[in-house]
Amino acid sequence: MPPPRSAGVLLFRQQTGELQVLLVKPGGPFWRNRDVGAWMIPKGMIEPGEAPAEAALREFEEETGTRLTDVPFPLATVRQAGGKMVEAFAVEGDLDPSTITSIEFEVEWPPKSGRRQKFPEVEQARWMTLAEAREYMLASQLPLLDALENILPEISRGGGSAKR
C-alpha cells in the first residue's frame, strides 16, 4: 500500500531584501508546549481525484482562511517521519499572520476521558527568515527551504496574490 499523500504551500516574500517564508504551528494539545521543530507549511491530505496543486491551494485556504490565486510552482516532495509524503508548492505572496482563521478538528481530550474537544488545525502563523525557519521548522520539511532557494530564480516575480 502506498504511503498517504498530502500537499501544501510554502508562501514566500521578499521583505527588506530578505527572503521570508510563512510557516504555521499546528493547534491542539500535542503541539501546545512545542515551538522549536514544530512549525510547518500549511498542508493536508490530497482527496481522491484531486490534483496535488489543487489540494495544496485548498489546504492553504482551509488552514489560513486565505485564498491564493497564483498558480503554485512545484517545489519538492518530502517524506515525513510517519511515512506520509508531502508534495510542496511555492507561491510568492503576502498576508498578515494575525488575520489567519483555521478550520477545526475534534479529538478526545484528555485521552480516555470520553470528552471530545475542538481545536484549530493551525494555532499560529509567522513570517520567518530562512535562518529562523531552519531553527523552528519540522525537520522533515527542512529540505523545502533549500528547494526554494534553488528554484527562486525560475519563479516569476509577478507578485503575490493572497486574498481573504
Placement of each model-derived feature along the sequence:
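Hydrophobic pocket-lining residues within nucleotide cofactor-binding pockets
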Residues: I46, L68, L95, I100, ...
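Short connector loops at helix/strand junctions that flank enzyme active sites
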Residues: P4, V36, I41, T69, ...
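Charged phosphate-binding loop/patch that engages nucleotide di/tri-phosphates or the phosphate backbone
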Residues: L130-R164
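The catalytic Nudix box helix
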Residues: I41-L75, T129
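Active-site-adjacent beta-strand/loop module that shapes the phosphate/pyrophosphate-binding cleft
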Residues: T77-G114, R126-M128, L148, E154
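N-terminal strand-loop-strand
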Residues: M1-M40, F89
